[in-house]
């Protein structure tokens, strides 16, 4: 009986740990364009080239995210995906070392550095005036 109780306790702890480390990934279906905004100046750029839209979408959607409490009030970049009709699919905000998506703040998965994403965004013509 003690072995069964111990086994159940171990299984419960494993399940609890798995729930704590649940990874989320951003999902964007069929984007036609991306609107990039940089904080602190109202600068915005709309990207429509399929290759560029796909590349940015792929990079953002591959980042493993873990739900967390917000640690930053200020944001640096906002990325909005639009469909072919110009309607918003979803929006992601980069805030310090976190990503905000669908009303939730997320920490990046282990080994992911948000500066890599911001470095790419810094190279977008017209965004950094």
Give the ranges of each region predicted by the language model.
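Function-determining sites in protein domains
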Residues: 20-129
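Sec-dependent bacterial lipoprotein signal peptides
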Residues: 1-19
């Amino acid at each position: 009986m003690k072995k069964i109780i111990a086994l159940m306790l171990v299984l419960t702890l494993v399940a609890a740990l798995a729930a704590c480390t649940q990874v989320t990934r951003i999902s964007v279906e069929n984007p036609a364009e991306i609107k990039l905004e940089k904080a602190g100046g109202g600068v915005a750029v709309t990207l429509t080239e399929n290759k560029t839209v796909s590349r940015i979408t792929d990079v953002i959607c591959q980042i493993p995210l873990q739900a967390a409490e917000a640690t930053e009030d200020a944001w640096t970049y906002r990325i909005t995906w639009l469909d072919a009709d110009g309607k918003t699919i979803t929006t992601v905000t980069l805030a310090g070392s976190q990503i905000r998506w669908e009303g939730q703040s997320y920490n990046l998965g282990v080994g992911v550095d948000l500066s890599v994403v911001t470095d790419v965004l810094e190279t977008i013509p017209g965004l950094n005036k």
